[in-house]
From Swiss-Prot:
Residue segments, region DNA-binding: 124-152
Protein's UniProt name: Transmembrane protein 18
Segments passing through the bilayer: 37-57, 64-84, 103-123
Family: Belongs to the TMEM18 family.
Length: 152
């Protein structure tokens, strides 16, 4: 049984930069050098996007533009990954951009998609609130008509 565990453990990739055995998304993210300036800027960008998502909840048109912009950025992640893979030496210490796009998906696309999910949740909540208000208004009008008919 230990021989099979050793064989399975040897199949797990080891990160070349930190010599950490990559067994999960968490260990993958731990192997990243987060002190690089471009990663700090990316983190600041995601904090800004999240704050803008929360602050734009009351402004429907701004939120639509923000939503469409983030969806377009996620859509362009594959092209951005290819571009970054070709030019990583100009801005990074390590080559994080693999052909499958795992790094860019986790670090770039997932936070943007979480923001879009928040926006969609706000839209669904608004729709339900509007439908509830409309139904209450309809019931009040119906009751007022019935009361008006009874008094005549």
């Amino acid at each position: 049984m230990t021989a099979s565990n050793t064989k399975n453990a040897s199949a797990i990739p080891i990160d070349k930069f930190s010599n950490v055995r990559i067994t999960s998304i968490w260990t993958f993210l731990q192997s990243v050098d987060w002190s690089e300036p471009w990663l700090m800027a990316l983190l600041a960008f995601h904090v800004f996007c999240f704050a803008f998502t929360l602050l734009s909840c009351k402004y429907y048109r701004i939120q639509i533009c923000h939503f469409l912009l983030m969806v377009a950025m996620v859509y362009s992640a594959e092209y951005l990954n290819e571009l970054a893979a070709m030019n990583w030496r100009s801005f990074s210490k390590f080559q994080y951009f693999d052909s499958k796009g795992m790094f860019i998906s986790l670090v770039y696309s997932v936070p943007l998609l979480l923001n879009t999910v928040i926006i969609v949740a706000v839209w669904v909540w608004r729709t339900f609130s509007t439908m509830t208000e409309l139904k209450i208004l309809q019931l009040k009008r119906k009751a007022a008509r019935e009361n008006h008919k009874k008094t005549q």
